[in-house]
């Protein structure tokens, strides 16, 4: 599919003396990767994916740009993003391909998100989009249509690829591709990537994993990339398109009034739909009370939101389903891990206890489930969000926090 693009400036010439030590290290690493140096770069039209493509070109790779068209409108993966991605490919003098994934995005992300909110949970659309819409379709399209066996994206994470010549080693770490946090702690996106399979990780490269966001901006400007100073989205793409998450949900779900109650059943307010609430939420409840109230639980069957003081929302454990084990195989025994239950939250110490999977886990081809026992009570644990397990910087695995009762 051909897209019209604005006239782009040619990429700036850079001598080796102008390169920073960090950039030289990244380029050197890319040059040393085994296999044919031909790759498709997932271009969203933002600065991160733009620099990813530029670094690969600098490292001497045969690069082709690949953009997924997910929806109409402004923003990355929308019509506006396609134009910027095409402009970057023009600057870098590389081919640009657009793949229409709007129907897949609608089914796997939009419908799943709306259904989740109806069920009183807070889904994590970014990880689902990565698993079902972005990585697998890009890998399959690049392999089938361009005979390219690798893809690269601008995610801030790292992959330590398996030592293919030691696949029979007793050392499990050498038998699996490992997913690691990005160097930039403020930008690390490994939390959203826990759901990627070993097969996918084997075909993926993350050139920005060793860089910081500020360095990326600086380098993009030095390259003269047209997206170097493009404003970064601060919200979910669907919320950005519609102006807010509430506006997005209002397009799909009509208002349905219900009660807001305390944990003892006392009615303290009214709401227009449980989909506008998430556990731990304090702002926007529309309730004047003698003390701050937080959402403690959501009961979809009763169309009811339960609120209370923050100390009533603490949990010592939670169940995690549809678990994907990334850097290790599924543990058969209890083990100590660090768990991150929200994107911007700090990892906390916990004990992971394997338990029997449900039929849903098995049907979703994720036959693993576990109970997480926190060292200290945790607040604002939201069903539908991901619980991702770490050991230091290594992503062990992760899954979906399951609904619970108070």
Curated annotation (Swiss-Prot):
It catalyses: S-sulfanyl-L-cysteinyl-[protein] + uridine(34) in tRNA + AH2 + ATP = 2-thiouridine(34) in tRNA + L-cysteinyl-[protein] + A + AMP + diphosphate + H(+). Disulfide bonds join 129-237. Its EC number is 2.8.1.13. Catalyzes the 2-thiolation of uridine at the wobble position (U34) of tRNA, leading to the formation of s(2)U34. One of its GO terms (biological process) is tRNA wobble position uridine thiolation. It is an enzyme of class 2 (transferase). The active site is at residues 129, 237. GO terms for molecular function: ATP binding; tRNA binding; tRNA-uridine 2-sulfurtransferase activity. The lineage of its organism: Bacteria, Bacillati, Cyanobacteriota, Cyanophyceae, Synechococcales. The record marks 155, 385 as: Interaction with tRNA. Keywords: ATP-binding, Cytoplasm, Disulfide bond, Nucleotide-binding, RNA-binding, Transferase, tRNA processing, tRNA-binding. This is tRNA-specific 2-thiouridylase MnmA. ATP binds at residues 42-49, 68, 154. GO terms for cellular component: cytoplasm. Belongs to the MnmA/TRMU family. PANTHER family: MITOCHONDRIAL TRNA-SPECIFIC 2-THIOURIDYLASE 1, TRNA 5-METHYLAMINOMETHYL-2-THIOURIDYLATE -METHYLTRANSFERASE. It comes from Prochlorococcus marinus (strain MIT 9211). It is found in: Cytoplasm. Pfam families: tRNA_Me_trans, tRNA_Me_trans_C, tRNA_Me_trans_M. Residues 187-189, 342-343 are annotated as: Interaction with tRNA.
């Amino acid at each position: 599919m051909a897209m019209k693009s604005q006239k782009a400036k040619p990429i700036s010439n850079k001598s080796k003396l102008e390169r920073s030590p960090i950039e030289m290290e990244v380029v050197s690493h890319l040059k040393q990767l085994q296999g044919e140096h031909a790759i498709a770069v997932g271009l969203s039209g933002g600065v991160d994916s733009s620099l990813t493509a530029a670094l690969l070109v600098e490292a001497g790779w045969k690069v082709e740009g690949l953009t997924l068209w997910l929806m109409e409108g402004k923003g990355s993966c929308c019509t506006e993003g396609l134009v910027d991605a095409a402009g970057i490919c023009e600057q870098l003098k590389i081919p640009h391909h657009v793949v229409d994934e709007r129907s897949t995005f609608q089914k796997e992300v939009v419908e799943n998100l709306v259904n989740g909110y109806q069920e009183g949970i807070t889904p994590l659309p970014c990880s689902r989009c990565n698993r079902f819409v972005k990585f697998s379709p890009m890998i399959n399209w690049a392999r089938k249509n361009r005979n390219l066996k690798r893809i690269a994206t601008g995610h801030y994470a790292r992959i330590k690829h398996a030592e293919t010549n030691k696949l029979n080693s007793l050392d499990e770490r050498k038998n699996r591709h490992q997913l690691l946090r990005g160097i930039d702690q403020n930008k690390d996106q490994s939390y959203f990537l826990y759901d990627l399979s070993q097969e996918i990780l084997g075909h993926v490269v993350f050139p920005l994993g060793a860089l910081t966001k500020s360095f990326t901006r600086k380098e993009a400007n030095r390259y003269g990339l047209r997206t170097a100073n493009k404003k970064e989205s601060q919200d979910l793409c669907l919320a950005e398109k519609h102006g807010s998450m509430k506006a997005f949900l209002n397009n799909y779900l009509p208002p349905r009034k219900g009660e807001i109650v305390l944990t003892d059943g006392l009615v303290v307010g009214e709401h227009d739909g449980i989909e506008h609430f998430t556990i731990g939420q304090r702002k926007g409840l529309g309730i004047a009370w003698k003390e701050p109230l937080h959402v403690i639980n959501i009961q979809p069957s009763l169309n009811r939101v339960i609120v209370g003081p923050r100390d009533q929302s603490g949990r010592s454990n939670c169940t995690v389903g549809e678990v994907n084990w990334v850097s290790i195989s599924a543990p058969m025994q209890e083990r100590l891990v660090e768990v991150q239950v929200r994107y911007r939250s700090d990892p906390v110490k916990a004990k992971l206890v394997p338990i029997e999977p449900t039929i849903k886990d098995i049907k979703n081809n994720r036959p693993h489930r576990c109970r997480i026992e926190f060292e200290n009570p945790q607040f604002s644990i939201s069903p539908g969000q991901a619980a991702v397990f770490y050991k230091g910087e290594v992503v062990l695995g992760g899954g979906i926090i399951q609904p619970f009762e108070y």
